[in-house]
Amino acid sequence: MADQQNIRAFQKQLGINLNRKNVSRKKGLRMHHSIGLGFKTPKEAITGTYIDKKCPFTGHISIRGRILTGVVRKMKMHRTIVIRRDYLHFIRKYDRFEKRHRNMSVHLSPCFRDVEAGDIVTVGECRPLSKTVRFNVLKVSKMAGSKKKFSKF
């Protein structure tokens, strides 16, 4: 429990009573749930010791709305990554497509380890978590070999 207490506020999961008398220590005090939509709960979310109230697997965040994919660009923020979504926009005058992209800030739960720039992530929409974050990482796929910069998954 001491390894999660790295900020001033006491870290604990909502709905877990830490003061119970008859606790089976084999199972431990950990709440996790399945988010549905065909996504599996990661092993680290079940057996880990991290506390993250914005995690869709161990926190009180529901995934509803859009499911998108993107490529990880930056990992410089704490528990937040920037992904790039490439798409084609049609120009009617020239009867051609042009390449465009959007960068999105996405919450990355600590249950996903070894995420690097270039990996493909699947994200799901949730309630606003901050000023710019409205999506949560649901699945991580390791990057393929050498790919072109602009690619439609």
Curated annotation (Swiss-Prot):
Q: Which family does it belong to?
A: Belongs to the universal ribosomal protein uS17 family.
Q: Which domain of life is it from?
A: Eukaryota
Stated name of the protein: Small ribosomal subunit protein uS17
GO terms in the biological process aspect are: translation
What GO molecular function annotation could you give as one example from this UniProt entry? structural constituent of ribosome
Query: Mind telling me which InterPro entries this protein's record contains?
Result: NA-bd_OB-fold (IPR012340), Ribosomal_uS17 (IPR000266), Ribosomal_uS17_arc/euk (IPR028333), Ribosomal_uS17_CS (IPR019979), Ribosomal_uS17_N (IPR032440)
NCBIfam families recorded: uS17_arch (TIGR03630)
Matching entries from SUPFAM superfamilies are given as: Nucleic acid-binding proteins (SSF50249)
The UniProt keywords, alphabetically, are: Ribonucleoprotein, Ribosomal protein, RNA-binding, rRNA-binding
- Asked whether the UniProt record includes RNA-binding among its keywords, one would answer yes
A cellular component term, taken from the record's GO annotations: cytosolic small ribosomal subunit
